[in-house]
């Protein structure tokens, strides 16, 4: 595979979506963080180079950093009792290539069903399922490209819908200076079957990011720019900042701040006239990375009364 051809394909695919994309999208569970490490760094990170299979959900190019024959399990508690769970398995293929398969499940729980008059007629449930295959390829000693193809189904009561999406990722990593730079186009695609006659758009997200370890010390900073095809809100709200404190090769602490989440979750304080985010947008996490076993956990604040916990565990056979 030629590096220039892959990069051109990535940029052309992203630009085609820009023309028709708006803010009304479906399958928004695909926006949620799967990786606890990424969740701890503000919910969006596409540049951290680690032996962490869950990061592949954020950038398929990062699959090349994952050990052969790795099984990864993830779980997240979300707002209003919703939960997500998933699993992935990755292995090294032919020269410079790595493969992976994954599945994600989101359960929104049971909800009250009413008729047009508002009378309760029973209960219904809602859930989303996604299955995917990922391929990454080392284009050179520093460039890696990756692609994820995904089939998605969604259920609300007796109704269902289906969609296909593709993630494209490109990563540049300079190990001598510990620079990592990535460009990712997430959720390119469309709906195959709708709930009704009106089809919804996929939650496309064009992202760019950088990570840098400072002076070979314990600190690594990350900055990710998201939703780069929509500029109808403040530029700073496109940014997600993260900090890793690498205590040893096996242990890290992480913290992040999501500017958009903090702004959107602001509420009026009863004490004064100022709005308060009540720590919305703040996230924290930690990880244990042994040779064969990995464990990651993250806490993220979404609202004064809502937070999420994300767990990842992985084992290399």
What are these regions (language model features)?
Residues 1-5, 141:
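Positively charged n-region of N-terminal signal peptides that target proteins for export
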Residues 16-20:
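Sec/Tat signal peptide C-region and signal peptidase I cleavage site
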């Amino acid at each position: 595979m030629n590096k220039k051809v892959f990069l051109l394909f990535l940029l052309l695919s992203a630009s085609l979506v820009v023309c028709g994309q708006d803010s009304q999208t479906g399958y928004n569970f695909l926006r949620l963080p799967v990786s606890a490490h990424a969740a701890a760094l503000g919910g969006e990170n596409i540049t951290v180079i680690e032996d962490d299979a869950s990061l592949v959900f954020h950038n398929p190019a990062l699959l090349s950093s994952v050990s052969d024959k790795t099984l990864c399990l993830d779980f997240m508690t979300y707002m209003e009792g919703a939960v997500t769970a998933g699993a992935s398995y990755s292995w090294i293929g032919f020269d410079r290539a790595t493969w992976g398969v994954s599945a994600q499940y989101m359960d929104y729980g049971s909800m009250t069903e009413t008729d047009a008059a508002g009378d309760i007629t029973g209960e219904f449930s809602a859930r989303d399922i996604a299955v995917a295959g990922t391929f990454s390829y080392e284009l050179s000693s520093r460039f890696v490209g990756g692609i994820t193809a995904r089939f998605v189904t969604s259920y609300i009561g007796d109704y269902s819908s289906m969609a296909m999406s593709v993630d494209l990722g490109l990563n540049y990593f300079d190990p001598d200076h510990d620079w990592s730079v990535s460009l990712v186009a997430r959720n390119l695609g469309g709906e195959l079957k709708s709930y009704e006659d009106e089809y919804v758009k996929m939650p496309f997200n064009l992202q760019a990011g950088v990570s840098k370890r400072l002076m070979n010390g314990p600190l690594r900073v990350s900055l990710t720019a998201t939703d780069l095809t929509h500029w109808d809100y403040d530029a700073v709200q496109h940014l997600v900042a993260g900090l890793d404190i690498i205590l040893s090769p096996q242990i890290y602490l992480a913290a992040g701040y999501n500017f958009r989440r903090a702004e959107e979750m602001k509420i009026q304080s009863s004490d004064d006239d100022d709005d308060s985010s009540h720590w919305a947008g703040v996230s924290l996490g930690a990880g244990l990375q042994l040779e064969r076993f990995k464990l990651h956990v993250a806490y993220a604040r979404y609202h004064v009364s809502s937070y999420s916990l994300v767990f990842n565990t992985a084992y290399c056979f």
